[in-house]
Amino acid sequence: GDVDAAFATADVIHEATYSTHRGQHAHLETHGSIAWVDEHGRLNIRTSSQSPFICRDKIAYLFGLGLPDVRVFCERMGGGFGGKQEVLTEDLVALAAMDTGRPVQWEFTREEQFIGSTYRHPMKVSVKLGATKEGVLTAMQLRIVSNTGAYGNHGGETLYHACSECIGLYRSPNKKIDAFAVYTNTVPSGAIRGYGLTQTVYAVESALDELARALEIDPFELRQKNVVRPGDPMLSLGEEISDAEIGSYGLDECVDLVRAALARGNGVNPPDGEDWLVGSGIAYAMHDAAPPTEHRSNASIELLEDGTYQLVSGTAEFGNGTTTQHIQIAATTLGATANRFHIIQSDTDRTGYDTGAFASTGTFVAGKAVALAAEALRARILGFAAQVMDVEPGMCRMDNDGVICGEGRISLAGLWLASREHGVQLGLSRKAYGSPRSVAFNVHGFHLAVNRVSGEIQILQSVHAADAGTVINPMQLRGQVEGAVAQGVGWALYERIVLDDTGKIVNPAFRNYRIPAYADIPRTEIYFADTHDTIGPLGAKGMGECPINPVAPALANALADATGIRFRDMPFRPDLIYKPIYEKFGAGVA
């Protein structure tokens, strides 16, 4: 489109710049690796990596080794949030192990975690919106400057993602983005939950609220006039057609759920006293279910001698719940209970290739590989059981520990034994890819109170609705949303990295890098849209990253609603927002 012409004829234009700051992953478990050279001369690394195969490839390249000469594997590693994609400890323990011939272990201290790992990219995002007086968007223009630090860790990829869904969520015939990733003499930025989109969603959703107030239109109504609908083309940042699709559309239901919950007002009451100002805010977000690259995953399932199954997946488990979900997917398809499965994961020697556990692909891509393998194995088991029992395949059905064929039945252990006698392999592998990609939707709403004397913010009500397609494990998904809200609240209200004049971090510890404690996090009402995705496994979509994206802008919009002041620079700490509040409500303030 032609944004200049659209702005020239717009009834109203809103233009402002919003800035975001660094955020640490703050996972309790720091980066750590153990390396040793075995009796065959192979380099072995046990590590806390979200991407063991990528780590293996990088280590092999770095030291001039063949891929078969390097094994990388992971056990349960604790939190990652994107940061454990980086090779930060593996290279040095490998060097030391090969040099000394002895096993070497290195685990970051908390200070090393702060100064030696990566952060969320600080960004300055200038947003210009044009609209008719009825609130229909006619032009959207962004200028993004992303601080990638001293090295370009994920600089280009994060910037690419930052540019897409933030404005792809809204219809407008004219869109333009100028985006820059710049090097600075500061700690490197890298991958972290949201992957650039969190920053730009904050800017766009804040700008939309400002536009709504300028037009005197309800913020919900302005968004509803302009959001994408099923059948709309997805925004493509290049010449090619986007492979993203709306596999299910639960945005309207998410909006209705959040709007109704805020209207009910099931939160806590505002504190007593005239110094507390109360406001509400909302924000939307859309997030692709996989990155726009060839993400792929292998999975295999085999029937074992005792009638149990062995499930093998290359993806890593770091608290994202893939172990449980993959077993659930396989168990559902094979008509079995979860305790019939043994799982092997994230080992470059023992599993098929997996690009990595990042970008919400644990369910959408790796889970799809599991589903395909389970479906293929089910078909083979039923066909072989029909052959053994001498019945038509359509007469057979699976249950937890056997196959029922008409009036007869054969146990899974018996079927395994028969497979040995007939030379039939009851184990299959399948691959899945991250294209085409579906999109997930999230809506968040807050009621909050801000003290006009101190600038203190208290969250009175927190509501989140998500379109995750089929919810495979509701408890785990609620945990993902609750964790995302906690991180979003921390990033927006508490956390702040301070650099000295040389770019050195001066607060590399939790005692002076404030993350939210249990008492700081509100109880969040969580709702799921009732949809079935046409692309994901069993109708599911990824929902690991998405819930964090609307949290900060919803807080910013609620703060503006309460005070009548628009704070565009994060974080919204009392010491940083007090002055404008004092200038507006200063009467009677000491």
Give the role of each language-model region.
Residues G356-F358, G362, I535-G544:
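Short, conserved non-catalytic motifs in the polymerase core
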Residues H342-Q345, P516-A540:
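Generic long, charged, amphipathic alpha-helical segments
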Residues P537-A556, A560:
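C-terminal structured "cap/appendage" subdomains that terminate the fold
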Residues G1-A465, R523, Y527, L555-A556, ...:
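Structural alpha/beta core scaffold segments of enzyme domains
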Residues T293-R296, V471-M475, G536-A540:
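Short conserved micro-motifs at the rims of enzyme active sites and ligand-binding pockets
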Residues V3, P270, V498-P516, D520:
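Contiguous domain-boundary segments centered on the initiation and propagation of an alpha-helix
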